[in-house]
Amino acid sequence: MRFDDINSRMDWNRFFTIKKVLEKYNIKSILGVVPKCEDKTLEVGKKNLDFFGNLRRFALYGDVIAQHGYSHIYDSKSSGFFGNTSNSEFAGHPYQKQVNKLSKGKEILEKESLWSPIFMAPNHSFDSFTLKALKKLGFNTVLDGFALFPFKSDNLYFISQISSKPLPVWLPCLSQLCVHVNTISDKELKHLIFFIEKNHKYFISLDNLQIKNNFLTLFDRKFISILMKFFRSFKKFNSFGSTIFFKCRCLFQ
Protein backbone atom coordinates (compact mmCIF):
# COMPACT_ATOMS: atom_id res chain seq x y z
CA MET A 1 0.00 0.00 0.00
CA ARG A 2 1.45 3.34 -1.03
CA PHE A 3 0.35 6.95 -0.57
CA ASP A 4 1.75 9.59 -2.92
CA ASP A 5 2.08 13.36 -2.42
CA ILE A 6 2.12 13.37 1.39
CA ASN A 7 2.33 17.00 2.50
CA SER A 8 1.05 19.21 5.32
CA ARG A 9 -1.94 20.54 3.36
CA MET A 10 -3.27 17.43 1.63
CA ASP A 11 -6.74 15.97 2.26
CA TRP A 12 -6.07 14.57 5.73
CA ASN A 13 -9.69 13.52 6.28
CA ARG A 14 -9.58 11.08 3.38
CA PHE A 15 -6.11 9.93 4.39
CA PHE A 16 -7.20 9.06 7.93
CA THR A 17 -10.34 7.37 6.60
CA ILE A 18 -8.14 4.93 4.68
CA LYS A 19 -5.45 4.74 7.38
CA LYS A 20 -8.01 3.67 9.97
CA VAL A 21 -9.02 0.69 7.84
CA LEU A 22 -5.39 -0.26 7.19
CA GLU A 23 -4.50 -0.16 10.88
CA LYS A 24 -7.57 -2.26 11.67
CA TYR A 25 -5.77 -5.09 9.83
CA ASN A 26 -2.24 -4.09 10.92
CA ILE A 27 -1.30 -3.17 7.34
CA LYS A 28 1.84 -1.07 7.01
CA SER A 29 1.96 1.58 4.27
CA ILE A 30 4.57 3.39 2.20
CA LEU A 31 4.23 7.15 2.66
CA GLY A 32 5.70 9.23 -0.17
CA VAL A 33 6.59 12.47 1.63
CA VAL A 34 7.34 15.68 -0.28
CA PRO A 35 10.10 17.24 1.89
CA LYS A 36 9.43 20.85 0.86
CA CYS A 37 6.15 20.97 -1.03
CA GLU A 38 5.92 23.98 -3.37
CA ASP A 39 3.29 22.46 -5.67
CA LYS A 40 0.13 24.48 -4.97
CA THR A 41 -2.06 21.86 -6.66
CA LEU A 42 -1.30 19.50 -3.77
CA GLU A 43 -2.46 22.01 -1.13
CA VAL A 44 -6.19 21.33 -0.82
CA GLY A 45 -6.84 21.71 2.91
CA LYS A 46 -5.79 23.40 6.11
CA LYS A 47 -2.18 22.98 7.16
CA ASN A 48 -1.47 20.09 9.51
CA LEU A 49 0.42 21.89 12.27
CA ASP A 50 1.87 18.62 13.59
CA PHE A 51 2.84 17.28 10.17
CA PHE A 52 6.26 15.86 11.03
CA GLY A 53 5.01 14.69 14.42
CA ASN A 54 2.30 12.67 12.70
CA LEU A 55 4.85 11.19 10.32
CA ARG A 56 7.07 10.12 13.21
CA ARG A 57 4.09 8.37 14.82
CA PHE A 58 3.32 6.61 11.54
CA ALA A 59 6.96 5.50 11.31
CA LEU A 60 6.83 4.11 14.85
CA TYR A 61 3.72 2.17 13.85
CA GLY A 62 5.72 0.59 11.05
CA ASP A 63 4.89 2.69 8.00
CA VAL A 64 7.80 3.35 5.64
CA ILE A 65 8.74 6.94 4.82
CA ALA A 66 9.88 7.38 1.22
CA GLN A 67 11.36 10.59 -0.15
CA HIS A 68 8.93 11.81 -2.82
CA GLY A 69 11.28 14.12 -4.66
CA TYR A 70 12.07 17.51 -3.14
CA SER A 71 9.56 20.28 -4.00
CA HIS A 72 7.26 18.41 -6.45
CA ILE A 73 7.72 21.16 -9.04
CA TYR A 74 7.86 19.85 -12.60
CA ASP A 75 10.49 22.08 -14.19
CA SER A 76 11.59 19.70 -16.94
CA LYS A 77 9.82 18.47 -20.08
CA SER A 78 11.40 15.03 -20.00
CA SER A 79 9.41 11.88 -19.26
CA GLY A 80 12.39 9.80 -18.14
CA PHE A 81 12.34 6.00 -17.98
CA PHE A 82 8.81 5.31 -16.76
CA GLY A 83 6.99 8.67 -16.88
CA ASN A 84 3.66 8.78 -18.70
CA THR A 85 3.85 12.49 -19.54
CA SER A 86 6.67 14.90 -20.38
CA ASN A 87 6.79 16.57 -16.98
CA SER A 88 9.45 15.88 -14.39
CA GLU A 89 11.15 17.23 -11.31
CA PHE A 90 14.30 15.25 -12.10
CA ALA A 91 14.55 13.63 -15.55
CA GLY A 92 16.26 15.88 -18.08
CA HIS A 93 18.19 17.92 -15.52
CA PRO A 94 22.01 17.81 -15.22
CA TYR A 95 23.46 15.35 -12.74
CA GLN A 96 24.61 17.94 -10.18
CA LYS A 97 21.25 19.70 -10.16
CA GLN A 98 19.56 16.40 -9.37
CA VAL A 99 22.09 15.71 -6.61
CA ASN A 100 21.34 19.12 -5.10
CA LYS A 101 17.57 18.57 -5.11
CA LEU A 102 17.78 15.10 -3.62
CA SER A 103 20.33 16.22 -1.04
CA LYS A 104 18.13 19.11 0.14
CA GLY A 105 15.13 16.81 0.49
CA LYS A 106 17.18 14.22 2.34
CA GLU A 107 18.51 16.88 4.72
CA ILE A 108 14.98 18.00 5.65
CA LEU A 109 13.83 14.45 6.39
CA GLU A 110 17.01 13.60 8.30
CA LYS A 111 16.53 16.69 10.47
CA GLU A 112 13.09 15.33 11.41
CA SER A 113 14.46 11.79 11.97
CA LEU A 114 12.35 10.51 9.08
CA TRP A 115 14.72 9.74 6.22
CA SER A 116 15.06 6.24 4.84
CA PRO A 117 16.98 5.20 1.69
CA ILE A 118 13.81 4.85 -0.38
CA PHE A 119 12.95 7.06 -3.36
CA MET A 120 9.53 7.70 -4.89
CA ALA A 121 9.80 9.77 -8.07
CA PRO A 122 7.20 12.50 -8.65
CA ASN A 123 5.21 11.64 -11.80
CA HIS A 124 7.15 8.34 -11.96
CA SER A 125 9.83 10.25 -13.86
CA PHE A 126 13.59 9.86 -13.49
CA ASP A 127 16.61 9.12 -15.66
CA SER A 128 20.12 7.64 -15.44
CA PHE A 129 21.44 10.77 -13.70
CA THR A 130 18.74 10.38 -11.04
CA LEU A 131 19.84 6.82 -10.34
CA LYS A 132 23.49 7.88 -10.18
CA ALA A 133 22.58 10.67 -7.74
CA LEU A 134 20.50 8.32 -5.60
CA LYS A 135 23.41 5.91 -5.18
CA LYS A 136 25.76 8.77 -4.35
CA LEU A 137 23.42 9.88 -1.54
CA GLY A 138 22.92 6.40 -0.07
CA PHE A 139 19.52 5.44 -1.46
CA ASN A 140 19.03 1.74 -2.19
CA THR A 141 15.38 1.39 -3.28
CA VAL A 142 13.30 2.96 -6.07
CA LEU A 143 9.52 2.59 -5.91
CA ASP A 144 8.94 2.26 -9.63
CA GLY A 145 9.46 -0.03 -12.56
CA PHE A 146 7.59 -2.15 -15.09
CA ALA A 147 7.65 -5.74 -13.88
CA LEU A 148 5.45 -8.31 -12.19
CA PHE A 149 7.88 -8.68 -9.31
CA PRO A 150 10.58 -6.57 -7.60
CA PHE A 151 14.04 -6.72 -9.15
CA LYS A 152 17.59 -5.46 -8.65
CA SER A 153 19.42 -3.44 -11.27
CA ASP A 154 22.66 -1.44 -11.08
CA ASN A 155 22.86 -1.93 -7.29
CA LEU A 156 19.36 -0.54 -6.71
CA TYR A 157 16.17 -2.39 -5.80
CA PHE A 158 13.09 -1.56 -7.87
CA ILE A 159 9.59 -2.19 -6.53
CA SER A 160 7.10 -2.16 -9.38
CA GLN A 161 4.07 0.11 -9.51
CA ILE A 162 1.90 -1.16 -12.34
CA SER A 163 -1.51 0.31 -11.60
CA SER A 164 -3.15 2.95 -9.41
CA LYS A 165 -6.24 0.75 -9.18
CA PRO A 166 -6.63 -2.42 -7.09
CA LEU A 167 -5.54 -5.37 -9.23
CA PRO A 168 -7.32 -8.75 -9.15
CA VAL A 169 -5.73 -10.87 -6.42
CA TRP A 170 -5.44 -13.85 -8.75
CA LEU A 171 -2.85 -12.09 -10.91
CA PRO A 172 0.63 -13.63 -10.42
CA CYS A 173 2.38 -10.41 -9.47
CA LEU A 174 3.35 -8.05 -6.69
CA SER A 175 2.60 -4.36 -7.12
CA GLN A 176 2.13 -1.22 -5.05
CA LEU A 177 -1.46 -0.07 -4.68
CA CYS A 178 -1.00 3.65 -5.31
CA VAL A 179 -3.36 6.16 -3.65
CA HIS A 180 -3.67 9.92 -4.18
CA VAL A 181 -5.95 11.12 -1.39
CA ASN A 182 -6.45 14.56 -2.95
CA THR A 183 -8.03 13.23 -6.12
CA ILE A 184 -9.66 9.92 -5.19
CA SER A 185 -13.41 10.09 -5.81
CA ASP A 186 -16.08 8.97 -3.33
CA LYS A 187 -16.82 5.97 -5.54
CA GLU A 188 -13.13 5.04 -5.77
CA LEU A 189 -12.68 5.50 -2.02
CA LYS A 190 -15.60 3.18 -1.31
CA HIS A 191 -14.22 0.59 -3.72
CA LEU A 192 -10.73 0.85 -2.19
CA ILE A 193 -12.01 0.32 1.35
CA PHE A 194 -14.07 -2.66 0.18
CA PHE A 195 -10.98 -4.10 -1.52
CA ILE A 196 -8.87 -3.70 1.63
CA GLU A 197 -11.55 -5.25 3.83
CA LYS A 198 -11.91 -8.23 1.51
CA ASN A 199 -8.23 -8.79 0.67
CA HIS A 200 -6.32 -7.55 3.73
CA LYS A 201 -4.50 -10.87 4.15
CA TYR A 202 -2.70 -10.35 0.83
CA PHE A 203 -1.02 -7.07 1.80
CA ILE A 204 2.66 -7.22 2.72
CA SER A 205 5.23 -4.66 3.85
CA LEU A 206 8.58 -3.80 2.28
CA ASP A 207 10.32 -5.77 5.03
CA ASN A 208 8.66 -8.96 3.79
CA LEU A 209 9.88 -8.67 0.21
CA GLN A 210 12.24 -11.24 -1.23
CA ILE A 211 14.00 -9.94 -4.35
CA LYS A 212 15.67 -12.44 -6.65
CA ASN A 213 17.19 -11.86 -10.08
CA ASN A 214 17.17 -14.64 -12.68
CA PHE A 215 16.23 -15.30 -16.32
CA LEU A 216 12.52 -15.11 -15.53
CA THR A 217 13.03 -11.72 -13.89
CA LEU A 218 14.62 -10.35 -17.06
CA PHE A 219 11.85 -11.79 -19.24
CA ASP A 220 9.25 -10.39 -16.84
CA ARG A 221 10.71 -6.87 -17.04
CA LYS A 222 10.93 -6.88 -20.85
CA PHE A 223 7.44 -8.30 -21.34
CA ILE A 224 5.69 -5.95 -18.90
CA SER A 225 7.61 -2.95 -20.23
CA ILE A 226 6.42 -3.66 -23.78
CA LEU A 227 2.88 -4.30 -22.54
CA MET A 228 2.74 -1.04 -20.56
CA LYS A 229 4.09 1.01 -23.48
CA PHE A 230 1.49 -0.55 -25.78
CA PHE A 231 -1.29 0.16 -23.25
CA ARG A 232 -0.23 3.79 -22.84
CA SER A 233 -0.01 4.28 -26.61
CA PHE A 234 -3.48 2.78 -27.01
CA LYS A 235 -4.89 5.14 -24.36
CA LYS A 236 -3.35 8.16 -26.09
CA PHE A 237 -4.63 7.02 -29.50
CA ASN A 238 -8.09 6.36 -28.09
CA SER A 239 -8.15 9.79 -26.41
CA PHE A 240 -7.02 11.47 -29.63
CA GLY A 241 -9.66 9.58 -31.65
CA SER A 242 -12.41 10.58 -29.22
CA THR A 243 -11.37 14.24 -29.43
CA ILE A 244 -11.45 14.21 -33.24
CA PHE A 245 -14.83 12.46 -33.25
CA PHE A 246 -16.48 15.00 -30.96
CA LYS A 247 -14.98 17.94 -32.87
CA CYS A 248 -16.27 16.56 -36.16
CA ARG A 249 -19.71 15.93 -34.66
CA CYS A 250 -19.87 19.50 -33.37
CA LEU A 251 -18.79 20.79 -36.79
CA PHE A 252 -21.54 18.88 -38.61
CA GLN A 253 -24.15 19.88 -36.05
Regions found by a protein language model. Name each.
Residues 1-3, 29-31, 65-68, 117-119, ...:
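Hydrophobic faces of well-ordered beta-strands that scaffold small-molecule active sites
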Residues 1-61, 108:
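Active-site beta->alpha N-cap acidic-glycine motif
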Residues 6, 34-38, 70-72, 146-147, ...:
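Active-site beta-loop-alpha junctions enriched in small/polar residues
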Residues 6-14, 35-51, 77, 95-96, ...:
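Acidic-and-aromatic substrate-binding clefts and catalytic sites of carbohydrate-active enzymes
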Residues 15-19, 52-56, 102-106, 131, ...:
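Generic structural signal for well-ordered alpha-helices
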Residues 26-33, 142, 183-253:
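C-terminal domain-boundary segment and adjacent tail
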Residues 73-85:
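Short, flexible, mixed-charge acidic loops at enzyme active sites
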Residues 89-161, 189-190:
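Catalytic domains of cell-wall/extracellular-matrix polysaccharide-remodeling enzymes
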